[in-house]
Each structure stands twice: as structure tokens, then as C-alpha cells.
Amino acid sequence: RRDFDAYADDMLFICENGALVMQRDQRVLIDPIDPSFISGIVTATKSLEGVYPVVCRAGVALIEKTASDEFIRNTRMYYPSVEVVADLTAPGRLPDVCKVAFYDEGDAQTHELPALRAKLEGPLSITLSGEHWVDVMKPGVNKGCAMRGIQQKLGISAAECMAFGDYLNDCELLQAVGESYAMENA
């Protein structure tokens, strides 16, 4: 939203890899993770050095106090509202968690992605969302599903929609619209 401030009130934003759609700071769609999974997700990479979880809720990203400066810098690039907490799984933090993202100071595809898939795939959806990022969501949640939800809610067809993508987590989004463009840096 902050990158589109002049036009933001006229736009819908697909957030948290499709688990949340916002318009004018209001939730249009939300598809949260079952709270019973959150603790297991957050602790899935505890044994991996340089990997940090971000618990994503509508409007705020939660990170732990033990985070590195590099991780905090990178998190603030993508999440305008970051709250540093002692325990990501403390009571009261689990409702409406849209996504748990993991930042890897190394290469996410070869380091954390295999570990997360081995521990979590099946009951959860896991996708590579950047060189250093892996996202964990409710099964079947992706940007394409969010786009189809928007289309249904607004009564518009895929042919009337356009999308731009820059990474692998945009594939379903690009397939859900009539006009799609992969960015040059993709």
C-alpha cells in the first residue's frame, strides 16, 4: 500500500501470498491458518541457523527479539508494521494468522525450503517467495485463489483482469487473469 499511496484507495491489495485481501484498510477476504498449527510452524526451523520466522496477521508482522539486524532490515522492507515480541506463539497472537514467512540469511531454496517441506507439507502449503523467503499458508491458499475470490466478489471475469508477477509465488495469480506479465527481474 505504501508504494501506491496516491492510488491506494482505488485499489485492492492481495496480501500475505493470497491469504488476505485488503481495500481501504478493510479486510475483503481472509483465509487464516488454523491456530493449532502456528506453534509447529514457528518452531519448524529452530535447528536451522540464520532462519527467522515472521508471523503475519492483517496489518502487522510479528518477529522475535532474538532476530538479527539483517533479518529486521529485510522484514521492514516488506512489512510496514513490525512488532518485536518475546514469544511468537504466546496466547492472543494466534487468531487470524494469514501466513508464517521464514527469512533465510542464506539461500532459502536449498536451505530452509527442504526442511519446511519435510516437516510441514501436506497439512500446509509451502512456497518459495523470494531468494531468502519461504511462505507457509493454509492449504490451497495462493494469489490465484485470492484473485478468483476478488473476481467473484466484484462480478468480473478473468478476461477483465491484469496482473504482474516477479517470483514463483505469482504463478497462480498470473494464470487467474486474462492479461499477465512476468517482470524482467523474475
Predicted regions and their residues:
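Short, solvent-exposed amphipathic alpha-helical segments in soluble enzyme
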Residues: D5-A6, L116-K119, G178
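Catalytic cores of alpha/beta
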Residues: R2-D3, L173-Q175
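Conserved acidic, metal-coordinating active-site core of Asp-based
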Residues: G40, A44, L48-F164, L168-L173
